[in-house]
């Protein structure tokens, strides 16, 4: 199955451009979310380096962000670049569990391979297994309780486009493979 950037951009924009004034945009080296302003009249999710996986990851952050956070650059997240200590890495991972669980669900809906991201290439991520397990536990919660409205809208659109199974089947989520 081929995953084209034009497709994920079109799917996202069809789902959310009108109601949320938000577009998915191929960006440069670093991803960023910028709310609408005087120069750009729409909210923009810029994903990095033309990677499909980056698009899914940045979308997941947008899906987690509430209405007020979507008014802030990068949703008001603190970000500490690569080279984080193991302790700071654990703090980083706490805010990544829900977005990465959604990213995994969306990737599965698109028939795309998901890999958990410690996003700390120049630092010591330490043992990432507890983080991966936490992401899996959040997937289980979403499977049981349902996805937030915007996430479910996009999941359904991906399922329709890629002709994948229309449910969150936990048998397709193997924490040892991420």
Swiss-Prot record:
Gene from which the chain derives: epmC
Entry EC number(s): 1.14.13.-
Superkingdom classification of source: Bacteria
Any Pfam family hit: EpmC
Chemical reaction(s) catalysed: N(6)-((3R)-3,6-diaminohexanoyl)-L-lysyl-[protein] + NADPH + O2 + H(+) = N(6)-((3R)-3,6-diaminohexanoyl)-5-hydroxy-L-lysyl-[protein] + NADP(+) + H2O
Family the entry assigns: Belongs to the EpmC family.
Organism phylogeny: Bacteria, Pseudomonadati, Pseudomonadota, Gammaproteobacteria, Pasteurellales
Molecular functions (GO terms): monooxygenase activity
Name used for this protein in its record: Elongation factor P lysine hydroxylase
Keywords: Monooxygenase, Oxidoreductase
Task of the protein: Is involved in the final hydroxylation step of the post-translational modification of translation elongation factor P (EF-P) on 'Lys-34'. Acts after beta-lysylation of 'Lys-34' by EpmA and EpmB. EpmC adds an oxygen atom to the C5 position of 'Lys-34' and does not modify the added beta-lysine.
Top-level enzyme category: oxidoreductase
């Amino acid at each position: 199955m081929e995953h084209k950037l034009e497709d994920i951009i079109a799917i996202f924009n069809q789902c959310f451009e009108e109601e949320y004034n938000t577009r998915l945009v191929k960006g440069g080296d670093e991803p960023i979310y910028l709310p609408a302003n005087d120069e750009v009249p729409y909210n923009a999710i810029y994903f990095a380096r033309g990677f499909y996986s980056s698009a899914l990851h940045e979308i997941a952050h947008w899906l987690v962000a509430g209405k007020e956070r979507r008014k802030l650059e990068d949703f008001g997240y603190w970000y500490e670049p690569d080279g984080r200590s193991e302790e700071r890495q654990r703090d980083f991972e706490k805010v990544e569990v829900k977005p990465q669980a959604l990213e995994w669900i969306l990737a599965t809906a698109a028939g795309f391979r998901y890999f958990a991201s410690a996003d700390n290439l120049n630092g010591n991520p330490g043992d990432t297994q507890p983080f991966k397990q936490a992401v899996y536990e959040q997937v289980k919660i979403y499977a049981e309780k349902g996805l937030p409205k915007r996430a479910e809208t996009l999941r359904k659109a991906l399922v329709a486009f890629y002709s994948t199974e229309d449910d969150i089947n936990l048998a397709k989520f193997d924490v040892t493979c991420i």
